[in-house]
Design a protein with these regions (language model features):
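Conserved ATP-binding N-box helix of the HATPase_c
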Residues: 1-21, 63-70
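Short, flexible loop/turn elements at secondary-structure junctions
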Residues: 7, 30-33, 47, 66-68, ...
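Hydrophobic/aromatic-lined pockets within catalytic cores
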Residues: 10-14, 48-51, 72-75, 333-340
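Short beta-strand-initiation
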Residues: 14, 62, 281-285
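A generic beta-sheet turn/junction motif
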Residues: 21-23, 294
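Hydrophobic/aromatic residues in the conserved F-box-adjacent beta-strands of the Bergerat ATP-binding
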Residues: 26-28
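Flexible ATP-lid and adjacent glycine-rich G1/G2 motifs of the Bergerat
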Residues: 31-98
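GHKL/Bergerat-fold ATPase module
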Residues: 76-666
């Protein structure tokens, strides 16, 4: 019923509408054009309307009859029929007449007034369509004389209007307007409260986008403010092929329609608050919301020719709507394309996101998908915004999880990044919708490695600057690489001391050990490369001195990469080093450092499986004869030996180190 009052306010060109009510009274006020005789007939006619203009909201009028139910308990029938209760209407075109009413001044009826008269109308509506004047004697249903609009009611009305309206007279324009005054029936305040909270408030706040002049709407102390939407308006001309095909009920004017969407601020803390508010509000409006058409939609749709059921709450599943809705969808698509063509990127992203974030239509309105939503969804699938423009195939679009700055073309030159990065938590709803509706997938470092052209990737790694390379390796190591275990071995990830990058497969091979029935992993015999590790980090320079090419990075610092490498045993590495030792190329200090490193008891750097016997096999030290002899084959200087054995003692320059001392046999 509240919408009936607001509808009248909009139709008569009001700039404001106030509704005041409490337990006993309801007062609806607007400052639009005063009623004329034609308008009065519209209110009094039963289940029809004299309104014919396409711009008049109430032209289809089930109308004002809903208001009458407010006068009594339940549907108000007993009060309407037995007690002859009804709403009182006052319509004026001079402010002095409003003031006279508020002050309870005497009034008198005037007969045979012309339609262009500026006299006010004051009447009580009995049985929904019988006008009773103040203090007018008429026949009741028993054909007895009675006064249905008493002086007491007139004074009561003026007093209550003065109480509620006086605070607004100075600041607002009331030089013309209409007032409806009702003594409320039992329980009606509670129903009005419920209707306001559940339907009216949100519906009107969106409807104000389509009601050009009506901007100041207040219910009791609550000011209703227009929820601003980006509105786009269109029309279907009379006599056009589309108009003829739609065949709207009223053919006196073009079909006017509009759609709206939230102007999303993607950088805000809660960018989709406006979208979520739209989604829990009615989707379709005929100036006011069709209350049962809440489609979980982020698109607002208004049309003056939409076909709705008699209760004004639901779309008709009929030929009018099945021809009309596709035309509105085409208009939305046209606007999307226009935004793209004129490079209005912001508007495109907002509308694209609004379409994408539309939820599932309730089952009882599922037919709307076929005639409206499906076309919108199909269009955005082939017009996906990307960081480089737009993509016509959503399967090539990826939601970026990749943090490092590496060209996506290395994976696939058709791939492109979705407009927004997945690491922005506030945009999660749009990523979820893109995955579900567009088939777009998140794309991280593991996905990239899986798809990457190995040669292109190797070339990029080779040419990357230090900061970019470090970022790439850090990100790669931060993920489990189980799904790319084989491929990761073929990528030249690590730079070595000769300035080149090598892959695991370049350096290490596998060999089946039949004796132990196992696969051994060994450094290739034709390679001089060694992966650096925590166990070799302290002897990097010595290894390079004896001819090894070692990785600049410590492999142990890349645990998720290393775990995918089948590394040779410490014993194999020790053997490889031992075989390459040339004591002539090492200084005395370097030789000592190698022996002490292998002989350490520090478990973090000690070679597993390498004990005293292995170290004694190293040929790094001279005896007193100046010959290089294995450590295990020299005598300690701590013993007194015959002169002929002194030649087999270690040189005195080695003897002083206690660690080395323990390696000699007595």
């Amino acid at each position: 019923a509240i919408y009936e009052f607001l509808q009248n306010a909009a139709d008569c060109g009001s700039s404001l509408f106030y509704l005041f009510y409490d337990e006993k009274y309801l007062i609806a006020v607007n400052n639009g054009e005063a009623f004329n005789q034609k308008g009065l007939r519209s209110i009094l006619n039963i289940s029809q309307s004299v309104k014919q203009s396409a711009s008049e909201i109430g032209r289809f009028g089930i109308g004002f009859k809903l208001v009458h139910r407010l006068v009594g308990k339940g549907d108000g029938k007993d009060e309407l029929v037995k007690d002859l209760k009804g709403p009182i209407m006052f319509s004026w075109s001079k402010k002095i007449d409003l003031l006279s009413l508020m002050n309870g001044e005497n009034i008198e009826a005037v007969d045979n007034i012309s339609d262009d008269s500026d006299l006010p109308y004051l009447l009580k509506l009995i049985l929904t369509n019988f006008p009773a004047g103040p203090n007018e004697t008429v026949k009741n249903l028993q054909y007895e004389d009675t006064v249905l609009f008493t002086q007491e009611e007139y004074l009561e009305m003026g007093s209550k209007i003065k109480e509620y309206l006086s605070p607004h007279l100075e600041q607002d324009d009331f030089n013309q307007g209409s007032i409806f005054f009702i003594r409320l029936g039992e329980g009606k305040k509670e129903l009005l409260d419920k209707d306001y909270e559940e339907n009216f408030k949100t519906g009107v706040e969106y409807s104000l986008n389509t009601l050009k002049g009506l901007k100041n709407v207040k219910v009791n102390s609550n000011q209703l403010v227009e929820v601003p939407l980006k509105m786009e308006k269109g029309e279907i001309a009379q006599e056009s092929e589309e108009f003829i095909r739609i065949s709207p009920e009223y053919k006196d004017a073009p079909i006017h329609y509009a759609f709206g969407y939230d102007q999303i601020d993607f950088n805000s803390e809660n960018p989709f608050a406006g979208v979520e508010r739209l989604k829990v509000s009615p989707t379709f409006y005929k100036y006011f919301p069709l209350g049962d058409e809440t489609h979980n939609s982020a698109i607002f749709v208004h049309c003056d020719s939409i076909s709705n059921q008699a209760n004004r709450r639901k779309l008709q599943d009929d030929s009018v709507n099945k021809e009309l809705l596709p035309e509105i969808a085409k208009f939305i698509i046209k606007k999307l394309d226009e935004y793209k063509d004129v490079n209005n990127r912001t508007a495109y992203l907002q509308l694209f996101s609004s379409i994408l974030l539309c939820g599932n239509v309730p089952s009882n309105s599922a037919w709307v998908n076929q005639y409206f939503y499906n076309a919108l969804l199909e269009h955005i699938k082939v017009n996906v915004p990307t960081t480089n423009g737009y993509c016509d195939n959503s399967s090539f679009v990826k939601i970026r999880r990749l943090k490092c700055n590496i060209p996506l073309a290395i994976a696939n030159d058709k791939y492109c990044w979705f407009e927004w990065n997945a690491d922005i938590d506030s945009l999660k709803p749009i990523f979820d919708a893109a995955k579900t509706k567009l088939g777009i997938k998140e794309y991280g470092i593991v996905d990239f490695i899986k798809d990457a052209d190995t040669e292109k990737l190797n070339l990029w790694i080779q040419n990357a600057d230090a900061e970019t390379y470090t970022g790439f390796m850090t990100e790669l190591n931060s993920h489990s690489l189980l799904d790319v275990s084989s491929k990761i071995k073929s990528i030249k990830l690590f730079k070595f001391s000769d300035g080149s990058f090598y892959s695991y497969d370049d350096i290490i091979t596998s060999q089946y050990n039949y004796t132990y029935r196992r696969t051994d992993y060994l450094y290739k015999t034709d390679s001089v490369c060694l992966f650096s590790s925590s166990k070799t980090e302290n002897i990097q320079q010595e290894l390079k001195t004896i001819g090894f090419v070692v990785s600049e990075s410590n492999l142990d610092k890349y645990t998720n990469i290393k775990v995918r490498f089948n590394m040779p045993t410490d014993a194999h590495v020790f053997e490889r080093i031992s075989n390459k030792l040339n004591p002539n190329n090492l200084s005395l200090a370097e030789k000592k450092k190698l022996i002490l490193h292998f002989a350490t008891t520090d478990s973090t750097i000690k070679f597993e499986g390498i004990g005293e016997s292995s170290i004694k096999g190293l040929c790094l030290c001279r005896n007193n004869n100046g010959e290089y002899v294995k450590l295990g084959n020299m005598l300690s200087r701590s013993y007194v030996v015959p002169s002929w054995l002194s030649a087999f003692q270690i040189l005195s320059s080695w003897f002083l180190n206690p660690c080395i001392l323990t390696l000699f046999k007595g």
